[in-house]
Amino acid sequence: MVLCLKKKTEVKKVLEIGLGTNNENVISNMGKYGKPGASIKAFKEFFSNANIYGADIDKEILFKEDRINTFYVDQTNIYTLNGLFKKIGKNFDLIIDDGLHASNANINVILSSLKFVKKNGYLIIEDIPFKAKHIWEVVSSILSTKHKTTLVKTKQCFVFIIKKN
């Protein structure tokens, strides 16, 4: 789906929520052998002209390097999401929610971030459990009047894709 954004060199601004903590005391962690920030580092290489932003609830894994800035966010608290966008601005080509894999947190991301996605940009919610399909069908029916929505079934989960019109 990322490949259909546009030419990868034209992508200028990407956000990933959920950097992949390896702190087993943090909900929705990758386990102690996980590598925090691996995906945003891959985005930095893939989208060679983009500024990459990341956000996570685990303050211990936040970092900054060339073209990458990371910030604290609690997806269950819409005020921290709103505060994140005050810091990082708008006009995102791609926002990926790979953080807390819970519908309430995912919906908070949609409510706070969709307005910051560029026209023809994408907001992607990853790792949706099969049992939550009905929730995302409702979300899709609400959003589909203004945006193109797709619920993609993979072997392990669903992925919800919003293309902003």
Residue ranges, per PLM feature:
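A short alpha-helical cap/connector motif
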Residues: 1-96, 100-125, 129-165
